[in-house]
Protein backbone atom coordinates (compact mmCIF):
# COMPACT_ATOMS: atom_id res chain seq x y z
CA UNK A 1 0.00 0.00 0.00
CA UNK A 2 1.06 3.61 -0.40
CA UNK A 3 1.03 4.08 3.39
CA UNK A 4 3.30 1.07 3.92
CA UNK A 5 5.67 2.30 1.23
CA UNK A 6 5.87 5.73 2.82
CA UNK A 7 6.65 4.29 6.26
CA UNK A 8 9.30 2.05 4.73
CA UNK A 9 10.89 5.07 3.04
CA UNK A 10 10.89 6.94 6.36
CA UNK A 11 12.50 3.99 8.13
CA UNK A 12 15.18 3.69 5.46
CA UNK A 13 15.89 7.42 5.63
CA UNK A 14 16.21 7.25 9.42
CA UNK A 15 18.51 4.22 9.17
CA UNK A 16 20.68 6.05 6.63
CA UNK A 17 21.00 9.04 8.97
CA UNK A 18 21.89 6.89 11.97
CA UNK A 19 24.19 4.50 10.12
CA UNK A 20 25.62 6.28 7.07
CA UNK A 21 28.33 3.64 6.57
CA UNK A 22 25.70 1.03 5.64
CA UNK A 23 23.11 3.28 4.00
CA UNK A 24 24.19 2.13 0.54
CA UNK A 25 23.30 -1.47 1.41
CA UNK A 26 19.59 -0.71 1.21
CA UNK A 27 17.38 -0.04 -1.78
CA UNK A 28 13.60 0.11 -1.85
CA UNK A 29 11.57 -1.10 -4.83
CA UNK A 30 7.81 -0.68 -4.68
CA UNK A 31 6.43 -3.46 -6.85
CA UNK A 32 4.20 -6.52 -6.93
CA UNK A 33 6.27 -9.44 -5.63
CA UNK A 34 4.03 -11.91 -7.48
CA UNK A 35 4.88 -10.56 -10.93
CA UNK A 36 7.78 -12.06 -12.90
CA UNK A 37 9.25 -8.68 -14.01
CA UNK A 38 9.69 -7.60 -10.38
CA UNK A 39 13.42 -7.51 -9.62
CA UNK A 40 14.08 -9.56 -12.78
CA UNK A 41 17.58 -8.06 -12.97
CA UNK A 42 18.33 -10.18 -9.88
CA UNK A 43 17.09 -13.50 -11.28
CA UNK A 44 19.42 -16.34 -10.33
CA UNK A 45 21.48 -14.26 -7.89
CA UNK A 46 19.59 -14.30 -4.57
CA UNK A 47 20.74 -16.56 -1.71
CA UNK A 48 17.56 -16.56 0.38
CA UNK A 49 13.93 -15.50 0.03
CA UNK A 50 12.24 -15.11 3.41
CA UNK A 51 8.54 -14.35 3.07
CA UNK A 52 5.44 -13.93 5.18
CA UNK A 53 2.94 -13.28 2.39
CA UNK A 54 -0.78 -12.67 2.73
CA UNK A 55 -2.16 -16.22 3.10
CA UNK A 56 -5.42 -16.11 5.04
CA UNK A 57 -8.25 -17.90 3.18
CA UNK A 58 -10.91 -15.41 2.09
CA UNK A 59 -13.61 -16.87 4.34
CA UNK A 60 -11.42 -16.94 7.46
CA UNK A 61 -11.72 -13.83 9.59
CA UNK A 62 -8.74 -13.68 11.98
CA UNK A 63 -9.64 -14.23 15.63
CA UNK A 64 -6.98 -11.93 17.06
CA UNK A 65 -8.48 -8.42 17.42
CA UNK A 66 -5.10 -6.77 16.81
CA UNK A 67 -5.03 -8.48 13.40
CA UNK A 68 -8.72 -8.44 12.52
CA UNK A 69 -9.30 -4.82 13.51
CA UNK A 70 -6.06 -3.16 12.40
CA UNK A 71 -4.25 -5.09 9.65
CA UNK A 72 -5.35 -4.14 6.13
CA UNK A 73 -6.97 -6.88 4.04
CA UNK A 74 -4.12 -6.50 1.54
CA UNK A 75 -1.71 -7.77 4.19
CA UNK A 76 -3.89 -10.70 5.28
CA UNK A 77 -5.85 -12.44 2.55
CA UNK A 78 -4.12 -14.74 0.08
CA UNK A 79 -6.19 -13.82 -2.96
CA UNK A 80 -8.25 -17.01 -3.28
CA UNK A 81 -10.79 -19.05 -1.35
CA UNK A 82 -8.04 -21.23 0.15
CA UNK A 83 -5.55 -18.35 0.48
CA UNK A 84 -2.84 -19.93 -1.68
CA UNK A 85 -2.96 -17.74 -4.81
CA UNK A 86 -0.47 -15.13 -3.59
CA UNK A 87 1.84 -17.63 -1.82
CA UNK A 88 2.00 -19.78 -4.97
CA UNK A 89 2.86 -16.76 -7.10
CA UNK A 90 5.62 -15.82 -4.67
CA UNK A 91 6.98 -19.39 -4.76
CA UNK A 92 7.11 -19.21 -8.56
CA UNK A 93 8.86 -15.83 -8.39
CA UNK A 94 11.32 -17.07 -5.76
CA UNK A 95 12.22 -19.99 -8.03
CA UNK A 96 13.45 -17.46 -10.60
CA UNK A 97 15.16 -15.10 -8.13
CA UNK A 98 17.15 -17.72 -6.24
CA UNK A 99 20.53 -19.01 -7.33
CA UNK A 100 20.98 -22.79 -7.61
CA UNK A 101 21.03 -24.10 -4.04
CA UNK A 102 19.30 -20.96 -2.70
CA UNK A 103 16.77 -21.21 0.12
CA UNK A 104 13.17 -20.07 0.43
CA UNK A 105 11.38 -19.86 3.80
CA UNK A 106 7.64 -19.09 3.77
CA UNK A 107 5.07 -18.71 6.53
CA UNK A 108 1.62 -20.09 5.68
CA UNK A 109 -1.77 -21.04 7.12
CA UNK A 110 -2.00 -24.35 8.99
CA UNK A 111 -4.19 -25.75 6.19
CA UNK A 112 -1.80 -24.92 3.33
CA UNK A 113 1.49 -26.68 4.03
CA UNK A 114 1.17 -29.77 1.88
CA UNK A 115 -0.36 -27.91 -1.07
CA UNK A 116 2.35 -25.23 -1.03
CA UNK A 117 5.08 -27.85 -0.61
CA UNK A 118 3.78 -29.75 -3.64
CA UNK A 119 3.63 -26.54 -5.65
CA UNK A 120 7.20 -25.67 -4.64
CA UNK A 121 8.36 -29.05 -5.94
CA UNK A 122 6.71 -28.37 -9.32
CA UNK A 123 8.66 -25.08 -9.45
CA UNK A 124 12.01 -26.86 -9.11
CA UNK A 125 12.52 -26.82 -5.37
CA UNK A 126 13.99 -29.81 -3.54
CA UNK A 127 14.29 -30.69 0.14
CA UNK A 128 10.87 -29.11 0.65
CA UNK A 129 9.77 -29.46 4.27
CA UNK A 130 6.75 -28.19 6.19
CA UNK A 131 7.72 -27.24 9.74
CA UNK A 132 5.65 -26.84 12.89
CA UNK A 133 5.58 -23.68 14.98
CA UNK A 134 6.10 -23.70 18.75
CA UNK A 135 2.49 -24.78 19.27
CA UNK A 136 2.96 -27.85 17.06
CA UNK A 137 0.97 -26.51 14.09
CA UNK A 138 2.32 -26.68 10.51
CA UNK A 139 3.10 -22.99 9.84
CA UNK A 140 6.07 -22.60 7.52
CA UNK A 141 8.00 -24.35 4.82
CA UNK A 142 11.59 -24.41 3.71
CA UNK A 143 12.65 -25.27 0.19
CA UNK A 144 15.98 -25.37 -1.61
CA UNK A 145 16.22 -24.45 -5.27
CA UNK A 146 17.62 -27.38 -7.22
CA UNK A 147 21.41 -27.22 -6.85
CA UNK A 148 23.55 -26.91 -9.98
CA UNK A 149 24.52 -30.27 -11.42
Predicted regions and their residues:
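S-adenosylmethionine
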Residues: 1-147
Amino acid sequence: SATTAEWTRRNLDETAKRYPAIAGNYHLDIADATQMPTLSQLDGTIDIVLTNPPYVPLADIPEQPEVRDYDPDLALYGGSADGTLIPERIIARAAKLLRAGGLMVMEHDITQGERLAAFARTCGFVDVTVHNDYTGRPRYLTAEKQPAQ
